[in-house]
Amino acid sequence: MLYKPSFAWYIYSYSANECIFASSLACACIQFRSAEIFSVRRDTEGSEILIYFNCDYTEGCHPNILKRLCETNMMQTVGYGEDEICDLARAKIRKACGREDVDVHFLVGGTQTNATVIAAILRPHQGALSADTGHINVHETGAVEATGHKVLPLPSTPDGKITAEQVENAYLAHVNDASFEHMVQPKLVYISLPTENGGLYSKAELTALHDVCTRCGLYLFIDGARLGYGLTAPENDVALADLCALSDVFYIGGTKVGALFGEAVVITNPALKTDFRYHIKQRGGMLAKGRLLGIQFDELFTDDLYFKISEKAVRQAKRIAKACEDAGCAFFAPSPTNQQFPIFPDTALEKLAEKYKYSYWARVDETHSAVRLCTSWATTDENVDALCKDIASVMAE
């Protein structure tokens, strides 16, 4: 077996981030003491559990966010994202985008955000074009379909992208069919940046998609659950301002990029702004204690924290990619982001699985499989050092 989940008891003894509260009539003072955090984590057989490289949401949140949440814990604000902290966060996101005219809304998670945005845009007879590997097509339990809208998959490139030519061909195939009114009408194009396979759309590719969507009367929606890791990849030539200019709506992912939870939807097309908060509420995305989302994005967009922690994760992933390459591994798909997809002999994976969690990705042949090794804002040098060393070791055997 290549990937064996382990059931574990987790026993944590904390001597860090101790919150010492001294309250007064005016404020609460919080002091954080930094010390070593000890974790004893054992599986059912008593051995230490694994180091996680399977995804980018295994940790909590960046310490700046945790500190700010504690500092503001007893603050009283209005609810549902209409507080002053959410307003500050929106202002910082608008500044980062270089656009004061965009609407910014905070939701809780990625699947909820995708379903809410797509359902808000489409009429009942319309569907969303997506890569066949797209998150809405394969990893959202039919969430978009549950809103009454069909996902229309297109074959993707090895790194998970679709092209402007594919979109135009799908549109023309529909309008030129004599029975077009008997089929779901493509009206929205869904892509993610980065893609599920770690691919990046270049500015030229996004421009081509934007242009074909404009010609065909389609909306372009960009899923940015891992946007920070895409924007900070050295190979990237796209900025937030470009996303504003080339898409109708996109979102800035927080859950996978330093936040406890949260996604920031940026609506650039004025036609899509009306009544969007109704849709958020209807889909269960309007958090009563909305300031918790505002606090997180306010911190992430203070002093470029969002981009700094993303860039660090990409650097760590590059180290892992080099270790795999040096050990003789091929790759399932090229990825310049925090997700890497090396191909290992199954025997090597069995050895790595004794110490590390990874995501099984695809069977390559009878004796080789592709896996995903994923870094995050919280990935440590020590864990990357250990993984790189062990990759070299198992591949040398």
Name these PLM-found stretches.
Residues 19, 27-29:
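Cysteine-centered motifs
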Residues 53, 162-224:
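Active-site phosphate-binding strand-loop segment of PLP-dependent enzymes
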Residues 62-110, 132-133, 137, 143:
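Conserved N-terminal alpha-helix of the aminotransferase class I/II PLP-enzyme fold
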Residues 122-185:
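PLP-dependent aminotransferase-like
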Residues 124-125, 318-395:
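Conserved C-terminal alpha-helix-loop-beta "cap" of PLP-dependent enzymes
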Residues 185, 192, 200, 233, ...:
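Active-site C-terminal subdomain of aminotransferase-like
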